Curated annotation (Swiss-Prot):
The gene is rpsI. Keywords: Ribonucleoprotein, Ribosomal protein. It comes from Pseudomonas aeruginosa (strain ATCC 15692 / DSM 22644 / CIP 104116 / JCM 14847 / LMG 12228 / 1C / PRS 101 / PAO1). Pfam families: Ribosomal_S9. GO terms for cellular component: cytosolic small ribosomal subunit. Belongs to the universal ribosomal protein uS9 family. GO terms for molecular function: RNA binding; structural constituent of ribosome. This is Small ribosomal subunit protein uS9. The keyword Ribosomal protein applies.
Amino acid sequence: MSATQNYGTGRRKTATARVFLRPGTGKISINNRGLDQFFGRETARMVVRQPLELTETVEKFDIFVTVVGGGVSGQAGAIRHGITRALIEYDETLRSSLRKAGYVTRDAREVERKKVGLRKARKRPQYSKR
């Protein structure tokens, strides 16, 4: 492994992303596929690029990502979190601007479990008075 790469782990919902930043031209590879090929949804692509656009490092790094678990939104959020952590490892001065944008904090919201006697986590069966 080269010493010129930075690593960050990102998590969101049940998705986990391992992100490697290497000096390059701005190519983003997710599970050996391009960003546009991996995410069909434009909002997901936008979420992934957010920390790079904020720190103006879009064409400074090649990014290699391995992501597992979750759905489209969770994976995009996990990749964003991982890129943020890798950028902080690369340059600690970026932390304040990334924190202000809210990218450093791990979004801890998880799916609430279904309870016995209820239809879903909180949805109750219809109440009948008589």
